Amino acid sequence: MAAIRKKLVIVGDGACGKTCLLIVFSKDQFPEVYVPTVFENYIADIEVDGKQVELALWDTAGQEDYDRLRPLSYPDTDVILMCFSIDSPDSLENIPEKWTPEVKHFCPNVPIILVGNKKDLRQDEHTRRELAKMKQEPVRSEEGRDMANRISAFGYLECSAKTKEGVREVFEMATRAGLQVRKNKRRRGCPIL
């Protein structure tokens, strides 16, 4: 039986952990060097609830320089992973300010999974000290859950690509969300612009 194909697009601020999350899930290796993404695609197979799904993973650049290029990734999207970094409260602030309006404009009705990346840094002393200098602290789980409710996300999960904690769960939830396409519409993804 052929696998069901679904398209997942990941968005969020630059350096918030999007590419690491995709690479750890699809290739099971953590990239130690940060190279800003312009545009990358990965394919990963996943089984959820007895269904074989081929996930096309579309990585995007979070940097503002790519704001005009990024919408080219959106057509026919089945599910969005909207990411912030737990060690960057500013990246959480950009979820309602930048990412939600952009995604809801280009992908109305496409389910959004809000993902808190770099969970391992929440208890990291160096991270806490650096944030304290700016009178900030790592994002708390309840802040993430509140944001997910605020933007009407399908769900909220936290993970660490570095330790692999929670990575598979993110993609299982995303796949389930992508499979919940209403049967009465042939295709519910983002329209082609």
Swiss-Prot record:
Q: Which PROSITE patterns does the record associate with it?
A: RHO
Q: Where does GTP bind?
A: 12-19, 59-63, 117-120
What is one process in the GO biological process aspect for this record?
A: skeletal muscle satellite cell migration
The answer to whether the entry has keyword Membrane is yes
Cross-referenced InterPro entries, in alphabetical order? P-loop_NTPase, Small_GTP-bd, Small_GTPase, Small_GTPase_Rho
Cystine pairs annotated here are none
Could you give a GO molecular-function term held by this entry? protein kinase binding
Q: Does the keyword rRNA-binding apply?
A: no
Lipid-modified residues of type S-geranylgeranyl cysteine are C190
* Membrane topology type: Lipid-anchor
Q: How is it modified after translation?
A: (Microbial infection) Glycosylated at Tyr-34 by Photorhabdus asymbiotica toxin PAU_02230. Mono-O-GlcNAcylation by PAU_02230 inhibits downstream signaling by an impaired interaction with diverse regulator and effector proteins of Rho and leads to actin disassembly. (Microbial infection) Glucosylated at Thr-37 by C.difficile toxins TcdA and TcdB in the colonic epithelium. Monoglucosylation completely prevents the recognition of the downstream effector, blocking the GTPases in their inactive form, leading to actin cytoskeleton disruption.
Record localization: Cell membrane; Cleavage furrow
Q: Which residue ranges does the UniProt annotation give for the motif Effector region? A: 34-42
Residues modified as ADP-ribosylasparagine = N41
Give residue ranges for the propeptide: 191-193
Kindly list the GO CC terms recorded for this protein: cleavage furrow; cytosol; endoplasmic reticulum membrane; extracellular exosome; nucleus; plasma membrane; stereocilium
- Which residues, renumbered to this chain, carry the PTM Cysteine methyl ester? C190
Q: Which keywords has UniProt assigned to this entry? A: ADP-ribosylation, Cell membrane, Glycoprotein, GTP-binding, Lipoprotein, Membrane, Methylation, Nucleotide-binding, Prenylation
The similarity annotation says: Belongs to the small GTPase superfamily. Rho family.
Q: Which NCBIfam families match?
A: small_GTP
Q: How does it assemble?
A: Interacts with RTKN. Interacts with AKAP13. Interacts with DIAPH1. Interacts with PKN2. Interacts with ROCK1 and ROCK2. Interacts with ARHGDIA. Interacts with RIPOR1.
The protein's job, in short, is: Regulates a signal transduction pathway linking plasma membrane receptors to the assembly of focal adhesions and actin stress fibers. Serves as a microtubule-dependent signal that is required for the myosin contractile ring formation during cell cycle cytokinesis. Regulates apical junction formation in bronchial epithelial cells.
Q: Which named protein is this? A: Rho-related GTP-binding protein RhoC
Which taxonomic lineage is given here?
Answer: Eukaryota, Metazoa, Chordata, Craniata, Vertebrata
